[in-house]
From Swiss-Prot:
It comes from the Bacteria. Keywords: Cell cycle, Cell division, DNA-binding. Coiled coil: none annotated. This is Probable cell division protein WhiA. InterPro entries: Homing_endonucl (IPR027434), Sporu_reg_WhiA_N_dom (IPR018478), Sporulation_regulator_WhiA (IPR003802), Sporulation_regulator_WhiA_C (IPR023054), WhiA_LAGLIDADG_dom (IPR039518). Belongs to the WhiA family. Disulfide bonds: none annotated. It comes from Corynebacterium jeikeium (strain K411). GO terms for molecular function: DNA binding. One of its GO terms (biological process) is regulation of sporulation. Residues 275-308 bind DNA. Involved in cell division and chromosome segregation.
Length: 328
């Protein structure tokens, strides 16, 4: 989770000056972290975040936009919490904050998705909504086979709204539900990199992209190595099998075999794991690999025909599983 902390630290340093963008980020942060309480007929907005920096950012933005200050409570780390949590509580002005950020509708009912001013807003507001959502409950995994950027959401409607905001900024995201928890997931590497850049985590994006390229290059090298190794094993098995068949062919034909075919066959028997090209260089005089292959094919064909005439096991009978013990 080191990358997640780096992303959040960088996002908390992003300077926002436009009020519409700031409002979108605040509304999103509250949507994905806040709970609404009714205390003495007054709505209290309570938001729980995982860092002092995020708590300070949210406090400053709300104060700048709405002139409302929260109570700040720190909950220490415990058995179920690795880090302290920061609870911001707006008791005075909670109703106004909930209405202005559309946590509730005009008649006071809770809204489950994102505010309409984000859904129908600008691309900058969609980016701000994603920044707020990531600061609220986002994390990113190290690049690899299962790399992902995820945001936990309080409802399916909130997840679908975030997917829609991602689509507006050309980022591919999907919803996912596991054990009753709704999430928005981005798995495409290019989309993850684009979103990090848009949100303002450029430095972390460069680190993530570098790790991604390293993993991809390593995986490609491993695939090539495995491919080459498999090819070598197949070639070695074929050469050993051919040598066993040639040896059986020479037994069947005995001395009744043309000298040039016998010479090629003897080379195959003496150099069991050599390639055809290597056998051609060892021949006297040297031959091409096609010439060696042709002579060995004719030798085996002659021997199989002779074995059929005499009722003997043919050259294929010499190829047994024990031959490949040393090769595999």
């Amino acid at each position: 989770m080191a990358l997640s902390a780096d992303v959040k630290a960088e996002l908390n340093r992003v300077l926002v000056t436009r009020h519409d963008v700031m409002t979108a980020e605040v509304a999103s942060l509250l949507r994905y972290t806040a709970a609404l309480h009714l205390v003495g007929k007054k709505i209290v907005v309570e938001s729980e975040v995982d860092s002092a920096e995020t708590a300070r950012r949210l406090t400053d933005m709300v104060e700048q936009l709405y002139k409302i200050e929260p109570e700040h409570q720190i909950i220490g780390a415990g058995n179920l919490r690795r880090r302290p949590r920061h609870v911001l509580r707006w008791t005075e002005g909670g109703m106004e904050l909930a209405r202005r950020t559309e946590l509730i509708d005009r008649v006071g009912r809770p809204v489950r998705g994102l505010p309409r001013f984000i859904i129908g807003g600008t691309k900058d507001q969609c980016v701000a909504a994603w920044r707020g959502a990531f600061l609220a409950h986002g994390y990113i995994t190290d690049p690899g086979r299962s790399s992902a950027l995820e945001v936990q959401t309080p409802s399916n409607e909130a997840a679908l709204a975030l997917v829609g905001a991602a689509r507006r900024i050309d980022v591919t995201a999907k919803t996912k539900e596991a054990r009753g928890v709704n999430r928005v997931v981005i798995r495409d590497g290019d989309s993850i990199g684009r979103l990090l850049m848009l949100m303002g985590a450029q430095d972390t994006r460069e680190v993530w992209e570098k790790q991604r390229r390293t993993r991809e290059n390593r995986a490609k090298a491993n695939r090539l190595a495995n491919f080459d190794d498999a090819n070598l094993r197949r070639s070695a098995r074929a050469a050993v099998a051919a040598a066993a068949r040639v040896e059986r062919a020479l037994e069947i034909l005995d001395n009744d075999v043309p000298q040039h075919l016998a010479h090629a066959g003897q080379l195959r028997v003496e150099h069991k794991e050599a390639s055809l090209e290597e056998l051609g260089r060892l021949a006297e005089p040297p031959m091409t690999k096609d010439a060696v292959a042709g002579r060995i094919r004719r030798l085996l064909s002659m021997a199989d025909k002779r074995a059929e005439e005499l009722g003997l096991p043919d050259t294929h009978s010499a190829v047994t599983s024990e031959l490949f013990n040393d090769v595999d």
